[in-house]
Amino acid sequence: MAIEPKVIEAFIEIPTGSQNKYEYDKERGVFKLDRVLFSPMFYPAEYGYIENTLALDGDPLDVLVIVSNPTFPGCVIDAKVLGFLNMIDGGEEDQKLIAVPTEDPRFKDVNSLNDLPKHKLDEIAHFFKTYKDLEGKKTEVGAYEDAEAAAKLIDECFARYKG
């Protein structure tokens, strides 16, 4: 029996369709342009993180929220976590949560990665496999894991943050 997806607040840094990589500077309370992607690619979903978490790469836990329309940097989205994509980036483990907004009726019946079009998951994996190629950096993309594994990962990252 499948578990109910965990609902989180996703703090969005980069809207769907952007080539700009923004990062939130907590000390200054502003969004800073970290870089523009070297490749003619764009973020395939809203990209951000869960506050008060600490992933294995030393940053807050990353989340992609698949939306009908782009939002904006600083938007907070209540989202159902469907699973995550395993990656290696810069030699470090890096997981990308995959989620959908709770407040969009188009995603009402989406409760697992299997409810998404396979092509969307392929787009996300392809993006993260190739988006740093022209920078001369390599990333490795692994398998997707389900909502139950994602819930465990989220709990671990909250606990790691609390130290």
Curated annotation (Swiss-Prot):
Which Gene Ontology terms cover its molecular function? inorganic diphosphate phosphatase activity; magnesium ion binding
Q: Where does Mg(2+) 2 bind?
A: D62
Q: Which Pfam family would be a valid example here?
A: Pyrophosphatase
Respond yes or no to whether keyword Nucleotidyltransferase is given for this record.
Answer: no
Q: Would you say which domain of life the source belongs to? A: Bacteria
Q: Which residues bind Mg(2+) 1?
A: D57, D62, D94
Arranged from A to Z, the UniProt key words for this protein are: Cytoplasm, Hydrolase, Magnesium, Metal-binding
Q: Which residues hold substrate?
A: K21, R35, Y47, Y131
Gene3D superfamilies linked to this entry: Inorganic pyrophosphatase
**One cellular component term from this protein's GO annotations in UniProt:** cytoplasm
Subcellular localization(s) per the UniProt record: Cytoplasm
Required co-factor? Mg(2+)
InterPro entries noted in UniProt:
Pyrophosphatase, Pyrophosphatase_sf
**What's the EC number here?**
3.6.1.1
Could you provide one GO biological process annotation from this protein's UniProt record?
phosphate-containing compound metabolic process
- What is this enzyme's catalytic activity, as reactions? diphosphate + H2O = 2 phosphate + H(+)
Major subcellular site: cytoplasm
Write out the similarity annotation. Belongs to the PPase family.
State the oligomer form and interacting partners.
Answer: Homohexamer.
Q: What does this protein do?
A: Catalyzes the hydrolysis of inorganic pyrophosphate (PPi) forming two phosphate ions.
Query: How is this protein named in the record?
Result: Inorganic pyrophosphatase
